[in-house]
Amino acid sequence: MLTLGLESSCDETACALVDANAKIVANVVFSQQDHVSYGGIVPELASRAHLQVFPSVVQSALKESGVSLEDIDLFAVTHTPGLIGALAIGVNFAKGLAVGCQKPIIGVNHVEAHLYAAYMEASSVEFPALGLVVSGAHTAIFLMEDPLTYKLIGKSRDDAIGETFDKVARFLGLPYPGGALIEKLAVHGCESSYPFSPSKVPGYDLSFSGLKTAVLYAIKGNNSNHRTPLPELSESQKNNISASFQKAAFTSVAQKLPNIVKKFSCRSLLVGGGVANNKYFQSLLKNTLDLPLYFPSSKLCTDNAAMIAGLGRELFLSEKITSGITPCARYQWESASVSLSPLP
């Protein structure tokens, strides 16, 4: 069984193929560069770019795997959550391919695919497992009974951790996206230079808006307001702020996990999302938890279609399918309580 996956939830246009053994045989990602000058994603530009490059991205994936569309047995596409226009482009393109090839199609949840990405590359995972999604748009903690069954334990009440990194990068005068740049600067900084505190939200939820504001005041001064311009910072200041902020942000997440592991007798940890690629974060989690940890490779941390194809294949084989696939911008947290949220 050969599954072709498509991803277009934000600014990456991606196509991948996964074979009958869940092995990735092609993984092509086109990253849009037009948004850099705007300091963030412009939804209309993203949608137009998806429309323009999807045909060539699919052709590249087929060429890489040495197959044709007629060889595809199943199509999988991201249908939620994400930018509604971008999702609509991907869903309609995938539907056209499926109808033309007279093959089945299945919708995949982008957040749940991030959770599945680490499982794809793991040799064996012991369950129940703790699942952690840390990306630019979502931050959430799940209890996983198996790869397709889980419940939501906690999530960010405001900004996602990746979004917070990008906003702090903007405060520092760094280009978008800024998460990887902060990680690089932090290596040369002192993480105790600024007394940024980790989140103190009770329970298993998270919050990053307070930390973001603390960084802003550390840069502009406590008596500043929204009209106060951002000052020029020295290289050492940028390094120290990056290191101190990074420590506080990741400690906010890591400090929640030991109690969850103990309460639910978790036997492993699966981490997904672009922020999972941060080496400081990986090291912190390894030092915090005494259990097997699974991170996706760099190519599967960021948005990609391999995780969409992989999870789509699992869902299809498990018969977790409904008749319709409709783009939906928001993640339905309330549906993540027993099993994978039903496809609309």
Curated annotation (Swiss-Prot):
Record's catalysed reaction(s): L-threonylcarbamoyladenylate + adenosine(37) in tRNA = N(6)-L-threonylcarbamoyladenosine(37) in tRNA + AMP + H(+)
Q: Where does substrate bind?
A: V133, V134, S135, G136, A137, D166, G179, N278
Q: Quote the subcellular location field of this record.
A: Cytoplasm
Q: InterPro entries given for it?
A: ATPase_NBD, Gcp-like_dom, KAE1/TsaD, TsaD
Q: Which GO terms describe its biological process?
A: tRNA threonylcarbamoyladenosine modification
Q: Which family does it belong to?
A: Belongs to the KAE1 / TsaD family.
Protein name per Swiss-Prot or TrEMBL: tRNA N6-adenosine threonylcarbamoyltransferase
Q: Which gene encodes it?
A: tsaD
